[in-house]
Amino acid sequence: MSRVIGIDLGTTNSCVAVMEGGEPVVIANAEGSRTTPSMIAFAESGERLVGQQAKRQAVTNPENTLYAIKRLIGRKFDTEAVKKDIAISPFKIVKADNSDAWVEVRGQKYSPPEISAMVLQKMKKTAEDYLGETVTDAVITVPAYFDDSQRQATKDAGKIAGLNVLRIINEPTAAALAYGLDKKKDEKIAVFDLGGGTFDVSILELGEGVFEVKSTNGDTFLGGEDFDQKIIDHIADEFKKDQGIDLRGDKMALQRLKEAGEKAKCELSTSLETDINLPFITADASGPKHLTMKLTRAKLESICAELIANLEGPCRTALKDAGLSASDIDEVILVGGMTRMPIVQKKVQDIFGKVPNRGVNPDEVVAIGAAIQGGVLRGDVKDVLLLDVTPLSLGIETLGGVLTKLIDKNSTIPCRKSQVFSTAADNQPAVSIHVLQGEREMAADNKTLGNFELSGIPSAPRGVPQIEVTFDIDANGIVHVSAKDLGTGKEQSIRITASSGLSKEEVEKMVREAEAHAADDKKKRELIEAKNQADNLIYQTEKSLTEFGDKIDASEKQKIEEGVAALKKALEGSDADEIKKASDSLMQASHKLAEAVYAKTQGAGAEGSEQPHGEQEAGGAAKGETVVDADFEEVKDDKK
């Protein structure tokens, strides 16, 4: 089995790790950073920028720079959560044909799994560059409170990125794996995970290599992005009071506010006050306007007080579902960049009655846990058993619009449960199975995962036919449902891809497009490299012609000049092969010139090394050769 990488696909940042010599290693990207911004930008030239490159140009290209796409994954366009995002996003969120929330950039529509796949491709490439081999197998993490359609969409993103997703695991569970791998004692821990877009809390029991999740709860629409938005609104309101201009109407100014707000939030984790300076933020008839203000930690905490208060409910519910009190918890592990905020740490201490453990890196621990799970699946990590749970109850709609639960929340997965139902009317030829996920009593108040029909039921009075409905949740937390007429043995099943999910054909089409785009990227890179080498060759040749052109025949000189002209013409086009061919021709034509350069430098070296003794003269010649080598090394460097 090939190497398995662990990927933390985050709302704000992503991270990749792998097992090396029995230890998990976080891999730095091409820019030297151990985390990569989960951002994608579409440049005017058609080029796609991923990560730090995308983040750097976000201010000047806000409408075509996508971020926090994880908040849209597996969601319908008409949900309240998506409407909230539409109001604050500089990019366009649109309704897809399947009612999903998609994005539109430069006239092209993309699904959230497609955009997430671009981030995953960057993580895959980062791992491949480090390992020096092709990587196909991965473990990808998701928030514990992700529902079935969000998990399925994440798995689709992996497939589009060219990855074989061996397992989808919950972020808090991954963090617990990383924390508890070398712990020998039995303990009960709470993992408090507040990331860029989601909040999870999981209660686990650890002991003898067994990691058993007792309960999980959370909010998939509460995270750092919401804190940033509160800061943006505060800054914009203050500026409006002062200058009478609402910056929220200007997408470029809004992006600058977002960056400044995020920076201020980070700075206030270690200092009590920070300055926000944004010169030339906007202009009116009286001239340019500058934004200058101070933000204190106390003010930040007051404007985010509502969000901080919302962290308590899921923690209390998770404790209750686990049958534990706060005093039963031995350690509280902090995960996610937002847990660096002092007010968040204080809230955790208030809820659990103990100082949280800050011994793990909150940005990297989830990817490390995913890599460990990859090691378990590959057989490299022994004596580790992970028992995860399903975060939400699953059931079907029954007579009167009621949700009848078959699998309760916090059931250990994988699991299977069957129940026998019957028809609601006489001679009913078919039953429609409406699959739901959620905790509300009425079906309409829960999330629809899918619908399917079992037909061909023989005529019989109502209540007579025996229809067995079976729910099966796999280790990824993805649901399979079947219905069987026990009288006839007829069966119908569905693998839930959610009514708003991508079809198999759509996923395969996106895989092909991603592969084609990777090939385009390779061609673009080859063209850029060929142009750079050609530019350097022209520069070196023209420089040598100026200095040594009189040392060669006029006919040779003309050939070189013609070669330079031909290469310059090839550079006007975008055919890498033509440029390479013209470069080779110029190099062939330049041989005589290279000899003249060599002879000149050789002569200079020999003159400078005249000595009274024979041996010294030989040494001088050697020294001259070294000078020549260095000269040629310099030419090579220029060509690179």
From Swiss-Prot:
What is the official name of this protein in its record?
Chaperone protein DnaK
**Chain spans, region Disordered:** 600-640
Role noted for this protein: Acts as a chaperone.
Question: Which regions are flagged for Acidic residues bias?
Answer: 628-640
User: Mind telling me which CDD domains this protein's record contains?
Assistant: ASKHA_NBD_HSP70_DnaK-like (cd10234)
- PROSITE patterns found in the cross-reference section: HSP70_1, HSP70_2, HSP70_3
Q: Does the keyword Metal-binding apply?
A: no
Induction trigger: By stress conditions e.g. heat shock.
Q: Which organism is it from?
A: Geobacter sp. (strain M21)
**A Pfam family this chain is assigned to:** HSP70
